[in-house]
Amino acid sequence: MSSILESIVFTSPNKTILYKTIHMQQTITLKYIEQIIECEYHRVLRNNSGCFVSNGTMGVALFMIWYGKNFNKVKYVEDGLSIIGVKCTHLTSNDSLDVHKGQVGIALGILWLSLSGIIQMPISGVLSHIDDNIFKKVSRISDYSLNKNLDQLLDVACYVALRLKYRSCTAMDDKIYSRFLSMLINYIYPDFYKMLQEEVYPGGYSYRLPRFIYLIQASFGNNFDNRLIRIIEEVQPLVLAQFPYMTANRLALANSIRLLAHTQHLCYRWGKHATMLVDISVPF
């Protein structure tokens, strides 16, 4: 698409007008985005909107930091970091665990800031308070309430897998986190077949199957690889028979399969199925 645009611009007699039009549209768009950022920034400062990723402080702050970093707006990076420091330090054990409106989302946000090089400090200490709350809350989930808490457990497991994958915890904690992750996968896996039967609307992150596949992919390298390989072999016929109706769900599933195929030697049918999920379209 960029080459087509360049050919139009550089061969057009009105290239100056085109340049000005493109620049004007970009300027208007950026100004509009910055107006929204300012409104959201003052909203989270004024109100107790929660410090979470979805409609909360962490979500606003992460976007401000991303925008400032990518468009050389240092002010937005600094303001985003400042509101995280002010608003995201008052977490309680009663808060939810999920990504959108829970502690896992905050922890993943901090992990992203560290991996992106935006915060230059060890994050094990920063995340230890959140981790303590997560461990305590998971330990209180009974076998009878596993089904009700499946989404939260799936989010927690993905978070722990990423902590281990990116070595963001101390060597002493590695063994504890690895055992905790193995326990979570053993909790979640029996409900795998229910995940296959449920396609959420309108789709996207709430679709559990891609998250489960991503969890398996991210969990390799933690002393229970043989268990993960057996899980892949067991679920292969069922996963390769899935064709979600919603486009967002098909793309999410295809992406998770490709991530797994990139790191593990899988039957060729996995890659073929991922391609089919992307290429074949249905009305929605």
Put a short name on every predicted segment:
Residues 1-23:
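N-terminal amphipathic/basic-hydrophobic helices that include classical n-h-c signal peptides
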